Amino acid sequence: MTSTATTPWTGMIPIDDTALACTDTGGTGIPVVYLNGQFATQNYWKRVIADLGPGWRHITYDERARGRKSETSADYSFEAGIRDIDAVLAARGVDRTLVVGWSYGAFLGAHWAARNPDRAIGAVLVDGAMPHDWLDDAMEERIRKMFKRMAWFMPLLRPTGLVPRLNAEQQATSNIELGKISRERELGPVMDSITVPTRYVLASGTSLGSKGNEQEVIRASLDKVVARNPHIRISAKVPSNHSTILRKDHAAVAAAVREVADV
């Protein structure tokens, strides 16, 4: 049994110096916790959740300083993101869960599944968590410039919850940290250590912040991951790009969730 009967709930979950806005659909189905993109919100998952339907227990939340309600923090590190998963699960009384992460959330999901093999039913990683050395000095500078260029309009959108309440430097630092976590010597051993059913859903082409075939080169790194670990497979490669995959190819993500649950 992975979930006891619960009623739908929406509220704030305290963790460290902050609190996270969370929604739990309740029910007795398999718990699925959804891990957002780096600066995205829980609303991105609505189509996947609709595809799966009410037979699952869907748990979504907004990370620190994301969305309209999650509070700011002194710590926006990757390890803080891992702690937040545990805080959400503890607050909702969930022991075992299936993790589904997109982009940055895929990295969180991979790390959490690797560290918690007895608690992870499985993982679905959507166009993220691919070991590749894409960060160098030139890329780091490109990241900082990109967030500086975006800084002028960010305050205008923050009241809508569409952009995070991190400043340009904080966003760049978070993205650069992700580049370091992505390195083959860092992420490769994490992927090799996963012992639960794990499925990738991959996007195609380029999206915001990438050039040429950069993202396809990164995706190609998964061939080695799949060859080394029999628990990991590619469920689908879809036509949509990284930014639109949850909107245009949500059905493929839902299918991967069912695939993992059926293993």
Model-predicted regions and their roles:
Residues 129-130, 134-158:
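A catalytic-pocket lid/entrance helix-loop region that shapes and gates access to the active site
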Residues 46, 50, 59-100:
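Active-site loop/oxyanion-hole signature of alpha/beta-hydrolase fold enzymes
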Residues 207-240, 247-249, 254:
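Conserved loop-alpha-helix segment in the C-terminal half of the alpha/beta-hydrolase fold
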